Amino acid sequence: MTARELVCSQRVGQGLSRRLRPLVLAVTLGVLVVTLSGCSWSDALAIGWPEGITPEAHLNRQLWIGAVVASLVVGVIVWGLIFWSTIFHRKKTTDTELPRQFGYNMPLELVLTVTPFLIISMLFYFTVIVQDKMLYLAKDPEVVIDVTAFQWNWKFGYQRVDFKDGTLTYDGVDPARKKAMVSKPEGKDSHGEELVGAVRGLNTEDRAYLNFDKVETLGTTTEIPVLVLPAGKRIEFQLNSADVVHSFWVPKFLFKRDVMPNPVANNSVNVFQVEEITKTGAFVGHCAEMCGTYHSMMNFEVRVVAPNDFKAYLQQRIDGKTNAEALQVIAQPPLAVTTHPFDTRRGQLTNSQ
C-alpha cells in the first residue's frame, strides 16, 4: 500500500467513525430512555397504542407491534444498505472504471421480488386472523346495548340481558316508542293515490330504524352519558345515528365503527361485539367522525363493573332510579370521571369580561 493510499484509508476510517458516532449515541440514549422510564419494550414498540381491555384489543395490539417490528427490520436493512453503499462505495479519485453493475442479475431480482411478497403475505395472513376475531358475531351475546348517536351526544339503552349462569334475564325493548317513530303518511295526490316519500317511500322525518328501550341513559349539555357494563360478559353493540354519520370509539377497545343513519338502507354493518371486558374501571369514549360544530365535545364514558354490581345497577334503573342514583347505590361515582361536559357559557363569559 502506498503512502497516499494509506492516508486515504485512514481518512475513510475517521470519516466512518464520525458518521457512526451519532448513530451509536442515539441508540444508547434510546435504550437508556426506555430502561430508566420503566417502560417495557412492548410499550415502546406499541408507539402510543394503549393497553386494551378486551381480548380483541389485545390481539389488535399484538398485530400492530408485529407490523412495527417488521417495518423496523426492513427499514434497518434498507438504511444499512444505503449507508454501506454511501460510505464504502463512493467514487474515489483513483477510480477509472464503472463499478460492477447488477442489472439483469436474475437471482438477485428474484430475491428482491419474492421477499416483499412473503412479507406482505405474512402481514395479510395475521391481519385476516385478527380481523375475523374482531368482527365475529356470536348468536347469544349476554348483553345487547342500543347505541344512538345524534348531534352532539349519545343515548344508550339496554335492549336485552341474558347471563349464561341464569342469574339475570331482562328484555328491555320498548315497542310503543319505536312504533311512534314510524313514518307518517305523506298524504294523497289529486287522483286519491297515497304519495310516496323521498326516502325509500318514507318521509324525511322517518326514524323507525332507531331502537328504543325501557332503560336508557341520555347525554345532555350538562351531563356526560355513562354507559355501565359488566366485566367478563360478551357484549353486543347495535349502532344507529339519528342524523349524520358519527363513529363509536372507545380507545381502550382499540376498535371503532361508524354510526350510520338507517344502516340497513345504507348497506352498512352497524353491529359489533366484544368477547368480554377484562378490566373494571372508567374508560372514555369519543365520536371519531367529524359531525359538525361540537364534534370534539361528543364524548361519553364506559363504566365497567363486576357482574353482581351490574345486576344491582340494572335493578335500580328498572325501579326508576336515574343513572347517577343507580351508580351511587353500587358505590360508583355518579357522574363521568374521565371527561367533562362542554361549557356552553364560555363565549358568554369571555364577552362579559
Curated annotation (Swiss-Prot):
Name the record gives this protein: Probable cytochrome c oxidase subunit 2
The record's free-text note on cofactor binding: Binds a copper A center.
Claim: Signal is one of the keywords in the record: yes
A molecular function GO annotation: cytochrome-c oxidase activity
Location of the protein in the cell: Cell membrane
Native source organism of the sequence: Mycobacterium leprae (strain TN)
Its job: Subunits I and II form the functional core of the enzyme complex. Electrons originating in cytochrome c are transferred via heme a and Cu(A) to the binuclear center formed by heme a3 and Cu(B).
Membrane topology, as annotated: Multi-pass membrane protein
GO terms of biological process kind: ATP synthesis coupled electron transport
Residue ranges crossing the lipid bilayer per the database entry: 63-83, 110-130
The gene coding this protein: ctaC
Pfam families: COX2
Similarity-based family: Belongs to the cytochrome c oxidase subunit 2 family.
Signal sequence annotation: 1-42
Key words of the record: Cell membrane, Copper, Electron transport, Membrane, Metal-binding, Respiratory chain, Signal, Translocase, Transmembrane, Transmembrane helix, Transport
Catalytic activity: 4 Fe(II)-[cytochrome c] + O2 + 8 H(+)(in) = 4 Fe(III)-[cytochrome c] + 2 H2O + 4 H(+)(out)
Cofactors that this protein relies on: Cu cation; heme
Documented EC number(s): 7.1.1.9
